[in-house]
Amino acid sequence: MAFVAASILPFSSCSDFLDREPITKPEAGNFLTGAIQVENYINGLYMTLPSFSKFGLGVRSEEKNSDNIIAEKYEARLHGQNNQFSGASDWQTGYQNLLKVNYFFHNYKVPEAQENEDVLSLKGEAYFLRAYWHFDLLKKFGSIPVMDAFWDENATIAGLQIPAKTRNEVARFILSDLVEAKNLLHSRGKYSGIRINKEAAMVLAMNVALYEGTWEKYHSSDDFASSTNESNYFLGEVINWGNELFGCGIDLYKTGQNPGDAFAALFNSKDLSGMGEVLLWRKYSSDEGVFHDVNGNLKAGVVDSEGAAGITQSLVDNYLNADGTFIDPTNEKFKDFKETFEGRDPRLIQTVMNEGAKFASATTATPMHLEEYTDEKKNTISPPKLAGDGNTRSLTGYHIRLGIDTTFVSGNGETALPIIRYAEGLLAYAEAAAELEMWSDDIANKTLKALRERAGVKYLAPAKDANFTDFGYTLTPVLQEIRRERRSELALQGFRLDDLMRWKADKLIVGKRGKGAYVGDESILFKSYSPDNQKRIRERLTLDDNKWADPMAGTLPSGYQFHADRDYLLPIPPSELELNKKLKQNPKW
């Protein structure tokens, strides 16, 4: 790796032991020989896991890289605007993080007599993290060199001529690391999900196997195909890991109140320790100097911190009615912003701002309320920010509600971040079973039905929905409903792009651009604005021929120009190809 040949970046830790000598020189005696040293080093590696930053929205706005959010600062990859250097940062980040993990393995010298369960669990965390970062690179680049050993600054150019493993070999390596992790890790209950644990490793393994299994199925006849199609093997691994996960006694989080409240609590709470469904999560505390600004951004109506944006009508239309029936998006009722949310899947109501929902504490934010504007009522009317400025402006009429802390007034954000949930495992199991044609009532009850009933949606046997997303190939009703459920359950959590890539879903991207709510003159949405703001909206917001918001019509007149023969993978950085002559560039780059 070029960055290895040039220099090894320093890795900071709170441990005095690790601060004494550069970690790139293990020969100097920097061995990890005791429990405290091991724990301090592993604690530092947690910085590489997903987090909310002190600025911006983090994962909440990440899905502008998909069909869930449309943004003025759109994703270059979707529009075919990546270049040969577009993968450089992801490549470097991935291998730098792997370098840090492998430094641990290289210098782990704890005597066997001192390897108690706690020390071994820390070692399991390292295996998990090595799997995690190889998976990240696999998704982005496909076939990659496996970094299963420590490459220090003394590595020679000749020593770095390492061929890439085929993608299925990489996936097998990742799963083998997760077997090691699972066998060493404590269960979730030991640290209430605040540390990497056995159950989190199982769900990560299911996600890896599902990704590879479906990639190999749907890309079997294109330039991104694996040299050996092992789709059924990997899908079978999802089932194997899932069967073990089912034995762990985990339940979906529920409350005795409104079903939607349980789903919302997963994302708007400060403490997730009592929610066993959240297998791994990140805690924030101003008292400990660890906080974020997600609450402040959501309070302001921000969907993308880089500019104006909005949740798409496509995502809104994905959700079922609460009685389990499909919606007909052509029904006139959906031209009414308020009626759009009535009688729907409670997850829609908890994910997208709607009538009566608060952007923050009621003491500082007026609940969203649409009503025909009059001077007498102007102080109680609070429509979406279609007439806003900068990044508070909505392009579609749909703001983010997921994660809003309705007790937040001002200052630092402290809502926790779920990293891995049990629900992901249920969705992976359901999809693998359907792909393997082993769907049954028992599997439905454990997965799809359980998720819908927790959300407050009646479970109906899957049937064909004529209005469901057209992927360009035939889906069984079961797969249709599983894909719908993934989008509903995992919206705005960073999964959608990965799903589109593994499903070979370029038909949902090429020539498409996200649209928004109905904004005709007679709509309650439009009538809720003052005359000045109505004029402003008409000057700034493009509508399609049927009066639905089409905000990117001028910028993307022909829709996204994703290159289906190239953009499913990122380009390997030119510097890496120059250094390692055994690497081969990805298709069409």
Segments and roles (model prediction):
Residues 117-124, 190-201, 257-259, 470-472:
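A glycine-rich, coil/turn loop motif that links secondary-structure elements
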Residues 34-50, 71-141, 157-193, 337, ...:
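Conserved, well-structured interaction surfaces
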Residues 94-97, 173-175, 259-321, 412, ...:
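Long, intrinsically disordered, low-complexity segments
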Residues 15-74, 144, 148, 180, ...:
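An aromatic- and glycine-enriched ligand-binding surface/loop that stacks and positions planar moieties
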Residues 341-453:
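C-terminal substrate/ligand-recognition segments
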Residues 123, 130, 205, 212, ...:
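Structural register within alpha-helical repeat arrays
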Residues 11-13:
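C-terminal motif of bacterial Sec signal peptides marking the signal peptidase cleavage site
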